[in-house]
Amino acid sequence: MEELQGYFEKDRSRQQPFLYPLLFQEYIYALAHDRGLNRNGSIFYEPLEVFGYDSKSSLALVKRLITRIYQQHFFLSSVNDSNQNKFVGHHHTNFFYSRFYSQMISEGFTIIVEIPFSLQLVSYFKEKEIQKSHNLRSIHSIFPFLEDKLLHLNYVSDILIPHPIHMEILVQILQCWIQDVPLLHFLRFFLHEYNNWNSFFITQNKSIYLFSKETKRLFRFLYNSYVYECEFLFVFLRKHSSYLRFTSFRTFLERRYFYGKMEHLQTEHLIIVCCDXFNGTLWSFKDPFMHYARCQGKAILVSKGTHLLMKKWKYNFVNLWQYYFHFWYQSYRIHINQLSKHSFHFXGYFSSLLKNSSTVRNKMLDNSFLIDTLTTKFDTAVPVIFLIVSLSKAQFCTVSGHPISKPIWTDLSDSGIIERFGRICRNLSHYHSGSSKKQGLYRIKYILRLSCARTLAGKHKSTVRTFLQRLGSRLLEEFFTEGEQDLSLILPKAIPFPFQGSHRERIWYLDIIRINDLMNRL
């Protein structure tokens, strides 16, 4: 225990002091601008979706509204008069402004706490003289790594990272990094007063995309802090269970994405793959015996060891969440399977190891004999059933996969409706371009195409056949995928038509930094 405490203190020696009054002063915005945290800096800047509008807000707008709240003694009236709580928004006459205020406050808080991580990240890159590799942020970059290493491993463990059941857990985690007590009290006050915080912390749906739009950035930061704490302890356990010790470990935050790097001895090292923070931070832990990867709230632990070793790590995780984070985690939520006999669902794909047997006849002089060879191949497949369930939740089809119309989009123009359906189809095909069998993906395209036709027919009070005949090739072209067009340029003879030809070619794109939204609904 003393060794663990010393490990914490050593890593957290850079605990950050924050100035609470900066939240309501101009200095914080000048500091953010000078440090390159605005649009031009591209370190933290993320366009903020204004509730109820299609336009984007700016840092100046955040400053203006927070200053306005401060001048109106907003917090004082919120605390003293709970029956007329402007912050929550239920009793305020203008619901838009109450939600908008909470959005601006959460943005201001996130800007403050992100600054030290940004400065640490910039100084690290300058110190190491390394260039940021945006390719490593791609979700697809993990699959070539798995394709290369999983062929020689035995067991895989599926882990669902539990959600914190109380906001105090997240505040206590931040308390380890932040010295400013008033700022922590402010965070507690904000979370208690915010009307939608229950939908994030206590929910039956395990998707973290239940955040409301106006505070998503703040909750992503809090969730990433929690996940980092989990993996911080996991690294500690891993370091003390390995014969080859790690030489250094650093973790950073870029925008709201955690970055990390480990430098090891010759036979082991750590690769960190980053994507859209909680739209999907992805880690890959590599050594000669164990591999760890996480995308969003799901992780896999793959090992060459025995089933007993995997059970050991399973109970390590259970004890970690039970005794350190103080909430119960059922051990049955961690599944241990043999790679050669089971597939696992990770990052939107069903992955498995396929064994192919081939026989070769060899002849030497007058003797001939047969040689049986067994090869193992890493295979990725589209989870068709999961995608259909996701489409049904998004009201594109029924649970059985029967396409239905999307009446909520009937207010758009015909070209707008076609463009939306086509964009969803292209994004799905782009993300699942690494599948070796794409017949299931063609079924998803068919559902979206027919749902688009039903939506247009319902808008004009006509039949589906009429619109299919009227649009013809135009509707079909909207559902051509970029991946198929790229593949047709690479292999023009193999693909005479985008929907026909070679459907076993796999393409991994290194520009995908977030998992598609339909998979997030699962």
Curated annotation (Swiss-Prot):
Family from the record: Belongs to the intron maturase 2 family. MatK subfamily.
Principal cellular location given in the protein's record: plastid
Gene Ontology CC annotation, any one: chloroplast
Protein name according to UniProt: Maturase K
Membrane-spanning residues: none
InterPro entries per UniProt: Domain_X, Maturase_MatK, Maturase_MatK_N
Keywords linked to the UniProt accession: Chloroplast, mRNA processing, Plastid, RNA-binding, tRNA processing
Species of provenance: Watsonia angusta
GO BP annotations, alphabetical order: mRNA processing; RNA splicing; tRNA processing
Listed GO MF terms: RNA binding
UniProt-annotated location(s): Plastid, Chloroplast
Coiled coil: none
Its biological purpose: Usually encoded in the trnK tRNA gene intron. Probably assists in splicing its own and other chloroplast group II introns.
